[in-house]
Amino acid sequence: MQTKYIFITGGVCSSLGKGLTSAAIGLLLEKKGLRVSMLKLDPYLNVDPGTMSPFQHGEVYVTDDGAETDLDLGHYYRYTNSFLSKASNATSGQIYNTVIKRERHGDYLGKTVQVIPHITNEIKQRIVNCGKQQENIDVVLVEIGGTAGDIESLPFLEAIRQFTYDHRNNCLNIHLTYVPYLKAAGEVKTKPSQHSVQVLRGIGIFPDIIVCRCEVNLSDEVKDKISLFCNVNRRAVIEEKDVEHSIYEVPLDLHKQGIDALICELLHLPNPSINLSEWEKILETIKNPKGTVTVGIVGKYVQHQDAYKSVFESLTHGALAAGYKLQIKRFEADKLPLDDNQLAKTIEGCDGYLVPGGFGERGWLGKIHTAKLCREKKIPYFGICLGMQVMAVEFARHVVGLNEANSTEFDPDTIHPVISLLSEQRGLQDLGGTMRLGAYICDLKLHTKAYQAYKSSQISERHRHRYEFNNTYKEQMEKAGFVVAGTLKGENLCEIAEVKDHPWMIGVQFHPEFKSKPTDPHPLFRDFIQAMIIYHKSQHGK
């Protein structure tokens, strides 16, 4: 069978949920026994999002091979079994950089290098390459970032037009659009969607399926109108209403409307019935939880919805595994009082606290005092990346007695550099793509909470950092009750730390949130939630 290609574009406005829709479609196709490969094309000129502010871009999702990618790849991972790598995300910056390097090398033999055909050819090659990451890929699902009509998106849309023409019997175009509801008029308006489709048709792309993001149910009359003016079959007008309970409703809702069957019909793919009972069970747990646990997130970017997207989702997965509902409280670390009593009052009401990764000194002390509170009050604490470094420095200052302990990231001249720059990072000039990135093997110490969670002596986790725990202080810290529970294979670098005689206080240098699924929660998030439930019951008796 020839490989099929599905292109998903967006119209009217951004942030409609193309990534979620793409992931949900990928899941449904996999349930039909198809092998799916996912690709995100981003029109921005950055080579990757690694140096972009979380306030602008949201989180940076890291793959096993060390690619810093768009957060939509996190959705792909959580919903599908698609293999994700550097080939799963391409930006304008990468594509232009590749073409310019070839021109400098003389690969174009003196030709004038242009957007068409050189840039568009490179885009098409990236699409083909994505389908070759693994053998026997049946469907390549390509999400195009941005909105129809954006100047930055034009080369990508032109490349898709050409690709669809070249593979006309093996391509499908899905357009995700917004159908607004005007409360004052009490009406749903289809005109923005009509114009969005007109933009695509003017480029030469003719959508086969229209997915309509909306706040209210669309009447048959509205769907008929969209079908008529957008020139698609009535069955191909799919409603994607705001979810009531969870984003994990999306694949179930799309399946009920038959989008997976329609895709298989249009692409002449096998169309067996599918079993979504696992996802139905997840939704049932969300609707009828045993109870509620509350986690406090103490970080720099907590007010941005997507800055810690994978962390929030992984916590939800852990709660689902226990049959509980998760409530999240967000605390901006730089605004927390540093007095212990005032801090306890400010962040009270949580069953556990998580300090996620981040860069920069802002909020550093607020995080340290949060870790101190958790250690002293025996409250569950989970530190990720910088959160582990916070835990180490707090322990060094307040337990070991190294009052000047710090990270050289914030105080290069500290007399007690408990956290220091990785040796391979010294002397680097560029910021982009130069951190320790991707999957590394970690050896776990027996009889630790980390070992109990993983039930394995060796694990693989993904990294994104420049600084590490300084082994000069290891013996001194361990004598005081600091446990190095996991180390980098072949080296003695601290990957996991625990506090002895604490119910659950763990810090990890890696990013476990990148390897958690609703159907397969990460063991550390699962056990963190369990520790929170135990703490909640000890405080409230239920």
Curated annotation (Swiss-Prot):
The active site is at C385 (nucleophile), H511, E513. Mg(2+) binds at D72, E143. ATP binds at S15, L16, G17, K18, G19, L20, D72, K241, D242, V243. It catalyses: UTP + L-glutamine + ATP + H2O = CTP + L-glutamate + ADP + phosphate + 2 H(+); L-glutamine + H2O = L-glutamate + NH4(+); UTP + NH4(+) + ATP = CTP + ADP + phosphate + 2 H(+). SUPFAM superfamilies: Class I glutamine amidotransferase-like, P-loop containing nucleoside triphosphate hydrolases. Belongs to the CTP synthase family. CTPSs have evolved a hybrid strategy for distinguishing between UTP and CTP. The overlapping regions of the product feedback inhibitory and substrate sites recognize a common feature in both compounds, the triphosphate moiety. To differentiate isosteric substrate and product pyrimidine rings, an additional pocket far from the expected kinase/ligase catalytic site, specifically recognizes the cytosine and ribose portions of the product inhibitor. This is CTP synthase. It comes from Protochlamydia amoebophila (strain UWE25). The lineage of its organism: Bacteria, Pseudomonadati, Chlamydiota, Chlamydiia, Parachlamydiales.
